[in-house]
């Protein structure tokens, strides 16, 4: 073995095994690409992305850790989300979305959350 060498097992590594998944359709209405990282609270992403934010509440992208998904302007795509794990507490990020994910009605405190034209549709 060499320093830094990684010895992997045989076969693929399952991604988020046994976790429930949600599929949502996202449209980038912004004039430039938006990139979202693997562990970012999806409901709090750039308001240029339009999707059902209530359905995304408490979820993150179902992609390998350290990767991201890029949303090009005007393009619609479907993404798969999994619940945020661990303590289900989101620190920082955007203040109106930060804190406990459970126990507050699954709605952030942002005054415009859920309004049409604020990156939300049902």
From Swiss-Prot:
Gene Ontology molecular function, alphabetical: urease activity
CDD domains cross-referenced by the UniProt entry: Urease_beta (cd00407)
Family, as annotated: Belongs to the urease beta subunit family.
Main location class: cytoplasm
Compartments where found: Cytoplasm
Gene3D superfamilies the UniProt entry points to: Urease, beta subunit (2.10.150.10)
Region spans: Disordered: 92-122
GO biological process: urea catabolic process
Top EC class of this enzyme: hydrolase
Substrates-to-products reaction catalysed: urea + 2 H2O + H(+) = hydrogencarbonate + 2 NH4(+)
Assembly: Heterotrimer of UreA (gamma), UreB (beta) and UreC (alpha) subunits. Three heterotrimers associate to form the active enzyme.
Pathway membership, UniProt: Nitrogen metabolism; urea degradation; CO(2) and NH(3) from urea (urease route): step 1/1
Cellular component terms (Gene Ontology): urease complex
SUPFAM superfamilies hit by this protein: Urease, beta-subunit
Protein name, per record: Urease subunit beta
Top-level lineage group: Bacteria
Keywords, comma-separated and alphabetical: Cytoplasm, Hydrolase
